Amino acid sequence: YQQLYPDFYVEGPAPALENRENTMYLTFDDGPSDLTSEFLQVLEEKDVKATFFVVGKTDETSKERYRQIVAAGHTLGMHSYSHDYKKIYQSVESFLDDYYQLFTLLKEETGVKTSVFRFPGGSINSYNMGVYQEIIAEMVRRGFRFFDWSLSAEDAAKRSPTAAAICDGILTRAEGRSRGIVLMHDSYHCKTTLEALPRLIDGLREKG
């Protein structure tokens, strides 16, 4: 598999999401969605940059949203093309097939060769136990860097928590932490995440 996709690599340092003290990094998985533009608007109003770990969508509206994310100065990351756990975790080759498809789509639509990625389900999950170490080694060899998360909005389920629950949950778990990576979802059902975002940003800033 090291011979597969010779143009599927990046050079130079990947963004370091966890090295700065007193910094909480905001990340959004599974977009773009009907809410992407609204998330971007809140982030602009609060003067905050985020990382969007996106999936593969080829409709024109989604392509435009990829471009909006980049134009607004945010980091575009890969979260797999298909988000199909059984498919992508079959083998290293299957993983590369899927992520190369997304890498190529994002490069064509935005001009960006994204260097960061996130595993669906996290880097170690019940679907990839036999293959995750090989996947990580191969992706790192190609210059990519993956990021899990340390704080979650718990908003992946179709029935999302209330905005207050999202905000209070993250702020409570952030107590005593000098840094962290916050997981949220940019999905059509995550209206309460959008509602929570302004207060969450203010609350994290108050904590320093």
Task: Name each region found by the language model.
Residues 1-26, 32-47, 61-67, 164, ...:
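N-terminal pre-catalytic segment of deacetylase/amide-hydrolase enzymes
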Residues 19-21, 46, 72, 113, ...:
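Residue-level preference for short coil/turn positions at secondary-structure junctions
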Residues 23-25, 50, 178-184:
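Generic beta-sheet signal
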Residues 25-26, 44, 48-56, 70, ...:
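Short, well-structured secondary-structure segments
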Residues 27, 36, 51, 80, ...:
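Ser/Thr-centric signal marking residues that sit
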Residues 29, 79, 120:
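Active-site glycine-centered loops adjacent to acidic/histidine catalytic or metal-binding residues
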Residues 60, 83-205:
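Catalytic domains of cell-wall/extracellular-matrix polysaccharide-remodeling enzymes
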